[in-house]
């Protein structure tokens, strides 16, 4: 009896689906409160005005309005939701 299995029989066979992360709403698009703006791991994009962050770093709109992306002095990417407009 062989001590090892045939070559690679049980180690292959995985091809996990992607996790659909990324920017879901782009700048100057209109959103409703609760809309997901960004799905991410860690804070690649930081929450700005009227944007909340979930425990998995998902950013979402807190109010109805228009999305605006910007950079801070420290070169951080920030997403905000501007009311009205």
From Swiss-Prot:
GO molecular function: structural constituent of ribosome
Signal peptide: none
GO biological process, one term: translation
Coiled-coil annotated residue ranges, if any: none
Disordered: region residues: 1-22
GO cellular component, one term: cytosolic large ribosomal subunit
Record-linked SUPFAM superfamilies: Ribosomal L27 protein-like
Keywords tagged on the record: Ribonucleoprotein, Ribosomal protein
Pfam families with a match to the protein in the record: Ribosomal_L27
Family: Belongs to the bacterial ribosomal protein bL27 family.
NCBIfam families given in the database record: L27
Name this protein carries in UniProt: Large ribosomal subunit protein bL27
Organism: Anaeromyxobacter dehalogenans (strain 2CP-C)
């Amino acid at each position: 009896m062989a001590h090892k299995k045939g070559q690679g029989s049980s180690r292959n066979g995985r091809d996990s689906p992607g996790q659909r992360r990324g920017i879901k709403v782009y700048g100057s698009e209109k959103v409703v409160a609760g809309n997901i703006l960004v799905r991410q791991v860690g804070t690649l994009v930081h929450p700005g005005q009227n944007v909340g962050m979930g425990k998995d770093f998902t950013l979402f709109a807190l109010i109805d309005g228009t999305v605006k992306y910007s950079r801070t002095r420290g070169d951080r990417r920030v997403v905000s939701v501007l009311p009205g407009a």
